């Protein structure tokens, strides 16, 4: 069954009573080569079933490509799953056998990077000729990370971003990223990067991405509240960039049934069709115009045509790391090297360092 399609074509604004919809902006004036069709996917993980989730991702990617999309962005933790509502039976000073086994199952649903699932995602990007931004749960040994993977339209794995700051109970199941994975990739369709969920509220992280020249700012999230749109609009205006926010749309039946999986504090009031994550995915222009979404109705492919000329139009009067910055007053230093718990040095290296 095909997904609900929501497409915005902002490159040739129709006339209404003799006036353009957005009279201050001639969206048809851009060079056609600067138009990028982008899709954000709003759909649920197949929980605890990574192969089935990959199959679903391919179906959605195929449908987006058929609609002409060049860039497709998936939600936070789409592969591996966002364990909304689960406590892993944690309390301060207390763990349980079931909670430990819940983590074992969650760990088994995560993926290695690199690994066979990454190879399959690369093949998907190549097959459908799209740039792919995918939210995953990354497994490194026995530590998990909330991660975004990037692929180009030739199937090349470009790199990853690990969430710097998990929120609340996420910190008990996910590790922390570091400055070595805050990439912005310069591609033929624009400079692409990502920040995940509430780390989008971190001004220093956003500023680092602006300084790297980000043009298409991807924001995979798990926040479906209406206030999220205001945050995304602010980032688009602040950074003079397109913002593509992708969230899952989930009902209770998308998760395992109790007692295998319990929604803390609300399980008794939920029916199988109860919405537990309402989506709200959206695409916003550098001028703060909502091009598509927010969608709170169900699983959907939310698409818009991005006129990259809007970036210059927006930065005409506000370039946050350019003519609107004050480097003699404010500065930001970023440590981009990996932070490892253990570093091994050979005797030769130690001798060289002592000289």
Swiss-Prot record:
Both catalytic activities are inhibited by N-ethylmaleimide and are up-regulated during senescence. GO terms for biological process: cyanide metabolic process; detoxification of nitrogen compound. GO terms for molecular function: 3-cyanoalanine hydratase activity; cyanoalanine nitrilase activity; indole-3-acetonitrile nitrilase activity; nitrilase activity; nitrile hydratase activity. The active site is at 76 (proton acceptor), 163 (proton donor), 197 (nucleophile). It comes from Arabidopsis thaliana (Mouse-ear cress). Highly specific for beta-cyano-L-alanine (Ala(CN)). Low activity with 3-phenylpropionitrile (PPN) or allylcyanide and no activity with indole-3-acetonitrile. Not associated with auxin production but may be involved in cyanide detoxification. InterPro entries: C-N_Hydrolase (IPR003010), C-N_Hydrolase_sf (IPR036526), Nitrilase/CN_hydratase_CS (IPR000132), Nitrilases_CHs (IPR044149). The keyword Protease does not apply. Its EC number is 3.5.5.1, 3.5.5.4, 4.2.1.65. Optimum pH is 7-9 for both activities. One of its GO terms (cellular component) is plasma membrane. The lineage of its organism: Eukaryota, Viridiplantae, Streptophyta, Embryophyta, Tracheophyta. This is Bifunctional nitrilase/nitrile hydratase NIT4. Belongs to the carbon-nitrogen hydrolase superfamily. Nitrilase family. It catalyses: a nitrile + 2 H2O = a carboxylate + NH4(+); 3-cyano-L-alanine + 2 H2O = L-aspartate + NH4(+); L-asparagine = 3-cyano-L-alanine + H2O. Coiled coil: none annotated.
